[in-house]
Amino acid sequence: GHEFWVASQDDKIIGFASYDQLRGGVGYRYSMEHTIIVSEKYKSMGVGKNLMGILCGHAKKRDINSMWAGVSALNVPAIKFHEGLDFKIVARLPKVGYKFGTFVDLVLMRKIL
């Protein structure tokens, strides 16, 4: 099922993380896709890295094989964040997203657990 964690400081939510199966169907039950959101004020302070550690640790205990990220090609800091945590770019899907009035590529990244 869907897993969810919250990072807080001084009783305020500063970030959250979740993961769920990459695609429907039993054939994908060992591949998860995650989302991590950290408040701008707390970026580059280790919050995202800590949340990712929790996500991947939890998934690994459940015998999950891989954690996936779908990142907008425009979001270079997020791509670098994932690369710093051993995610590898495995595909780039051209113009599948729409942001800021234009179509954008989706970068698929994977970490083997």
Give residue spans per PLM region.
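Conserved beta-strand-loop-alpha-helix junction that forms the acyl-donor binding cleft
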Residues: 43, 69-79, 96
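Conserved GNAT acetyl-CoA-binding A-motif
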Residues: 59-71
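Short secondary-structure boundary/hinge segments and terminal tails
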Residues: 29, 60, 77, 100-101
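Conserved acetyl-CoA-binding loop-helix of GNAT-fold acetyltransferases
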Residues: 38, 44-61, 76-84
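Conserved catalytic-core motifs of GNAT/GCN5-like acyltransferases
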Residues: 18-21, 68-71, 88-105
